Amino acid sequence: MGKVLKTVEAITAKTKIAIACQGGGSQTAFTAGALKALCEARIADEFEIVSMSGTSGGAVCAVLVWHALERGDHQPWRQLMDFWQDNSAKGWAEIAFNQLLVESVRMINSGLLPTFQLSPASAVSQSLMQFATMGLRENFTSFQTLLEKHVDFAEIASWGPRAKRPILMVGAANVTTGMLTKFISNREPIRVEHVLASCAVPTIFPAVLIGEDAFWDGLFSDNPPVQELIRPSSVGAENVPEEIWLIKINPTRRETVPVRIDDIIDRRNQLEGNISLFQQLRHVEMLNDMQLSHAFRPEFLGQFDIKAPVRIPKSFSGSPNKPYHIPCIEMSPELAETLDYESKIDRSAEHIEHLIIEGEQCARAFLRERALTVAAEPLVATSS
């Protein structure tokens, strides 16, 4: 009878997944669209979201959905959509400011305008920004104000460290120690400073001080955290995922060699954004391959409820196929080719809306492709 019950439980158990959201400024409106589509598809009926991670704009999207899920919202994507609508330029003044900023940076990166290197923490930079943004909404000019409007950090603080699923993980880089830092919801309440730290691009925002430490953008950390999602010491032994769903912003492949300086800057940023991701995926691949080779004792795997290798996406399309590979959610090559570095700071409503729609479409395609892939490559349990 006991064996029968265990068999029924195994059949009806939901697949445990972790969702990792890469950073990329305004381009992470794509991530927002993808998360919206996943929620609308009612993935919770079939899957158990055990953890979410993100850096920079990916962290913002992850925090918004996580907060809504923790509050029991039946439509967790609405909080996400409200944020991005508020983050878009509204009215002629904001539209003009956004266009001037984007085009100025584009001309500087193209070598058509001189650049003046000013620290974002300097009094001159802050005075210039205050002058340039006079009359604009505070939600548009103050990132902290925008975050605090859409996420109740006081409520999160009242929860304390939260062991409840999903576990939230926000990546940032410690400027002075060089350590890759993860702010994890089961260890401490997620604060607005944690999200600001993950988004602190050093040429745009001053380093974020938390206690005696200063932090920069998650691009210099794990973009996004992936390895930590499978570590029991980070997420809890019961929250090790069976699959990691990656929402990727930076394209892996480019068809032509960049020659113009603005194209070089764009491609360099993409490569920098993917370095840590690929390193982490290769590490998980190595562990998966060892598991398939029976390098781990069944009783060791049983401690963490690990029944098979963790399904993850491939780093490169030309790499050999492995039975644990699944697709990732990423932009179509056609869209990626139309985006440049400056599109990561573009907050025009049309740009944001286009990326959200693309994210929705790609997430729906991912669900279809993933189902076919998993059906074609069932993983045999490696522990008893």
Predicted stretch roles:
Residues 1-53, 60-384:
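Patatin-like phospholipase
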